[in-house]
């Protein structure tokens, strides 16, 4: 994970979240009032549906632990914990040429259009 975090040059925020059974993030949309941002979400453990559920744009979204996901959090999203000791990383990354290049390099099927 350290190599992953070191790639970005402008973080808006980055924090780890711990969820326990019964905790949740209500359905909401993120608003970017000043600077445009990308949201990267990294579930670290317990991503099976009987452990934790993530609702994204009215659907239950499947996630793989340890995999970073780029999310459009202007779409409605939220999550619900059914077991204890769930850990995730949430990152807000400012959109700039460097960070955009990092994203395109990380995406397996992204083509470069200049």
Task: Go through each PLM region and give its residues.
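A short secondary-structure junction signal
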Residues: 26-30, 50-57, 81, 101-102
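Conserved metal-binding segment of the jelly-roll/cupin
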Residues: 61-76
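A short hydrophobic beta-strand segment most commonly corresponding to one strand
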Residues: 38-44, 68-70, 84-101
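Active-site or metal-binding loop neighborhoods of secreted/extracellular toxin and effector enzymes
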Residues: 99-113
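Signature of the catalytic double-stranded beta-helix
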Residues: 1-23
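Asparagine-centered strand-capping/turn motif at beta-strand->loop junctions
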Residues: 77-83
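A short beta-loop-beta micro-motif enriched in histidine and acidic residues
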Residues: 10, 26-39
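A short beta-strand-loop-beta hairpin characteristic of the jelly-roll/cupin
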Residues: 43-64
């Amino acid at each position: 994970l350290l190599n992953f975090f070191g790639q970005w040059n402008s973080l808006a925020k980055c924090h780890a979240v711990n969820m326990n059974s019964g905790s949740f993030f209500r359905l909401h949309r993120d608003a970017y009032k000043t600077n445009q941002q990308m949201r990267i979400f990294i579930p670290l453990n317990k991503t099976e549906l009987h452990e934790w559920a993530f609702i994204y744009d009215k659907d239950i979204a499947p996630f793989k632990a340890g995999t970073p996901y780029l999310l459009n959090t202007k779409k409605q999203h939220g999550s619900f914990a059914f077991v204890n000791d769930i850990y995730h990383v949430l990152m807000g990354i400012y959109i700039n040429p460097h960070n955009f290049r990092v994203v395109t390099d990380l995406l397996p099927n992204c083509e470069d259009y200049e």
